[in-house]
Amino acid sequence: MERVHLTAWLALFLIVVANATPTPARTPTGCPADCTCSLSQHTHKPLYHLKCNSTRGLRLTEKTFQSTVPVHSIDLSHLNLTRLSHLLDKLPELTSADLSHNQLKDLGHLGKGLKRLNLKHNQLTSDKLRKLPQHLQVLNLQHNNITHLPLELTHMHQLHQLELSHNAINCSCQTLEVRNWLVERIVYMEHPVVCSYPLEFRGRSWLQLKQDEICKKEKYQWFDTEENELMMGDQPAAVSAEREDEEELGKDFLPIVGNPAATAKKVRSPQIPLPSDQVEGSGDLSETNMELKLPEETVAEPEAAESQLVDAAASPSVLEEHIVKDEDEDDEGSGSGGGLLIIPDPSKVKITSEDDIDSDGKPEESDVRPLENPENSENPDTVFSNKIGIYEGDQEEKKPVEEDNIVPVVMTNLDTGLESDVVTDGPLDSSKESEDILTAKIGKPKDDSSAIYYLLAVIGLIVVGLVLFVAIKRCKYDSNAAARDAEAQRQTELLDMDKKQLGKPLHKNGHGNGQEHSPLIGEKTKLDEAQIVKKPYENGEAKDGAGQQPLLNGNGSANGGTKEAPETGEPAAHEYYPITPRYPTPQSPRASKYAQQQQLAEQNNNEPDGAYLPSSPKSGRYSPVYSPETGRVKIKLTETPKPKTPMLVTRSKSNAGDIITTPVRPIEPTHQVINGH
């Protein structure tokens, strides 16, 4: 029984282990021959990676490769492939291909869905890069035969990684244009690109070169080369053409009996075939056929000169058409130089005997005579006078057609500003740049315009900030003007005196509890020490009547004296105490001097009790316009009464209309002596 349980537990353990261990993916039944299909790692869904040892299996597959798990990558490296045809078209879901370490010279057709492509260690040239898919994201082109970068690379808008090292890169103006696009798109390069050409920049990174400098240098180098050729007096292409003409003419004229193919060259001045000669535009090849048949008739019997002249005269129209064509080609500046070389030798041209034979000046007979008379071919003057396009007589008047629009463009410099009339693939508008160039050049003007706009925006923000700063400072300055004005800090309009309050005691001065709502005397400040305050009167001289009332502005009694406190310390019911400063005021010697002399020497308003009034504003408790003791009251000079010393007065009007002001005499209490004892 125990053995049965042990076997059951062992079987259960094996089942659990088998389920927990990941089994390798099966090779699909439809996997191509010579290929291994494996499950890719680090993918969200199952995808197959195809590793092939040859392309035989993919070529034998007639239809699209189908399997339950799609194939997203393939490895065809180290197979010595020279060309890749439509093999990758059979894998529609392919996104990555490794074609490295082959001998590929042409890519063929690649899938449009490719995202990653490895082409290092191949033999690809720059022209083959135009066939690359435009949706590539990662491209490796190391160790190839790439010399420059075509503008078609700027169409790969999804490209974010590119490798171009170990290539003989020519850092030309066009290549640097593509470089600017790559830098603008922030395309990552692990290995730097080193320039191989121009020679003066060999070994330098292409990031160190400026496109404007290279473009200008290429243009200047071309102009310098053209000037040097002009200074030499000849152009290489024209000189070589003239020498070849002389050699060909010598070969044609030296042999008396030659084959028709050799004699056919005399009809047309031999030179390098031009595009205008190859494609005439008329579509008629009859002239070419007649040109080939003409030597057969003239060279049939080389010894019979007279018969050949008759045959040549019998068909003048054929020769006339060809001569006109040859003359047009020479006049178009093809570079043969035949006309320019014959002009200095008119005498030598007239020596020939063919001119005397043909009285009408027909060039056909003169063109045929050198073949009949080999003795005349030895004279170089005779050869050049009749074979390079210089005709005597009135042959120029017999031009049946004029083809001035056909201009040879062999010597046209494509880098100069000259317009070209040659049509290669289709109609080209020289005033418009191609879309590739516009796409590649759109980066730099955009950067310049955006930089200008950013600069203007920054300047505008600075100006607006300065204006706001000045405005805020100005507002703060205006708002603090009142705070800086000492007289304008606490402005309170002085109201008219309420005469109903006069005569009331202090504790009933308009308030039931005898307390002021706000203190009339503020805190002592530094200005208090600067005020000139009269020294208090002596105790014996300070006599304040019991019925005298203080002023409402808090300046105390009229004479500025203080009430002597009773000895018992208990004030009488009818006594009041004027408001005195909280802190002792400094005594001035001048104030004390005036206080001692005012009782004897002065009388105010003819009153005997005028001693209680100060003789001078400086000696009494004079309240100026602004005082720390009355800081919250502002009195204007035009509103202050005369005399300025506050006192209790009575005003009356005389018969003459004058106002008479009389100070009220203080009432001396009768009980003051009793309380003193």
UniProtKB/Swiss-Prot annotation:
Sites carrying sugar chains: 53, 80, 145, 170
- Name any GO cellular component annotation: membrane
Name listed for the protein in its UniProt record: Protein windpipe
Stretches assigned to the Extracellular side: 21-451
**Transmembrane residues, as ranges?**
452-472
Stored InterPro entries: Leu-rich_rpt, LRR_dom_sf
Entries under Gene3D superfamilies matching the protein: Ribonuclease Inhibitor
Q: How does it assemble?
A: Interacts with dome; the interaction promotes internalization of dome and its subsequent lysosomal degradation.
Q: Which gene encodes it?
A: wdp
Q: What happens when the gene is disrupted?
A: Homozygotes are semi-lethal with a few escapers displaying no visual phenotype but showing disruption of midgut homeostasis under normal conditions and enhanced tissue damage-induced midgut regeneration.
Species of the source: Drosophila melanogaster
Summarize tissue expression. Answer: In adult intestine, expressed in both small progenitor cells and large nuclei enterocytes (at protein level). During embryogenesis, restricted to the developing trachea.
Does the keyword field hold Cytoplasm?
Answer: no
